[in-house]
Amino acid sequence: MNSIKFPVLDRTTKNSVISTTLNDLSNWSRLSSLWPLLYGTSCCFIEFASLIGSRFDFDRYGLVPRSSPRQADLILTAGTVTMKMAPSLVRLYEQMPEPKYVIAMGACTITGGMFSTDSYSTVRGVDKLIPVDVYLPGCPPKPEAVIDAITKLRKKIAREIYKDRIRPQRGNRCFTTNHKFFVVGSPHTGNYDQELLYAPSSTSEISTETFFKYKSPVSSNELVN
């Protein structure tokens, strides 16, 4: 058999040869073609929707919005996440193929926002449900900030190795797709001392400790398994 002669690289051919690794080639192809899943629940999604217009044109970053989680590799949670919506969000994330990424957009998604103080149905941070790669604060963040978050995610993907793509099993997560909620009753029963309620006006200065009689058979109102 004739021996195979490899061409000698000279100055005329060195510019047409690309030296890379399979890992870098895979990272480059993924960061240049992110397919986000449209998941908006509040006003933050209005800012994300403005990226589709000609002013910002997020198509130049290779973003192709998808409506199916099985065709997406990026989910951008924009808006408030409630307890009732949490199992659906986890189910969508689990249906996305690996490798997959998450951008938490807005204060309501990251910490619960203004609804986290007195709302019983708001999740205080989406990272309690699914792992988050990039946090994007704001109320709501501007479209320029969304582009900056996508750029940071692209830089993270470019530095990934194969072991980084294998997501560890979620530990200490609050919800799963088959999670059952059990609400513990509040220790504050609201029972008042009838004698104090019908006391004359001269006894208006009553200490707070003696006005309410609370029973505390259980701990404070919380969600338990």
From Swiss-Prot:
Cofactor: [4Fe-4S] cluster
Superkingdom of this protein's organism: Eukaryota
Gene Ontology BP, a term: electron transport coupled proton transport
Alphabetic keyword roster: 4Fe-4S, Chloroplast, Iron, Iron-sulfur, Membrane, Metal-binding, NAD, NADP, Plastid, Plastoquinone, Quinone, Thylakoid, Translocase, Transport
Membrane topology category: Peripheral membrane protein
Gene Ontology MF term list: 4 iron, 4 sulfur cluster binding; iron ion binding; NADH dehydrogenase (ubiquinone) activity; quinone binding
InterPro entries: NADH_UbQ_OxRdtase-like_20kDa, NADH_UQ_OxRdtase_20Kd_su
Chain sites annotated for binding [4Fe-4S] cluster: 43-44, 108, 139
Cofactor stoichiometry and binding remark: Binds 1 [4Fe-4S] cluster.
A cellular component term, taken from the record's GO annotations: chloroplast thylakoid membrane
Catalysed conversion reaction: a plastoquinone + NADH + (n+1) H(+)(in) = a plastoquinol + NAD(+) + n H(+)(out); a plastoquinone + NADPH + (n+1) H(+)(in) = a plastoquinol + NADP(+) + n H(+)(out)
Main location: plastid
PROSITE patterns referenced in this protein's UniProt entry, alphabetically: COMPLEX1_20K
Entry EC no(s): 7.1.1.-
UniProt-listed Pfam families: Oxidored_q6
Summary of the function given for this chain in its UniProt record: NDH shuttles electrons from NAD(P)H:plastoquinone, via FMN and iron-sulfur (Fe-S) centers, to quinones in the photosynthetic chain and possibly in a chloroplast respiratory chain. The immediate electron acceptor for the enzyme in this species is believed to be plastoquinone. Couples the redox reaction to proton translocation, and thus conserves the redox energy in a proton gradient.
PANTHER family recorded: NADH DEHYDROGENASE, NADH DEHYDROGENASE [UBIQUINONE] IRON-SULFUR PROTEIN 7, MITOCHONDRIAL
Family: Belongs to the complex I 20 kDa subunit family.
Subunit structure and binding partners: NDH is composed of at least 16 different subunits, 5 of which are encoded in the nucleus.
Name the UniProt record assigns to this protein: NAD(P)H-quinone oxidoreductase subunit K, chloroplastic
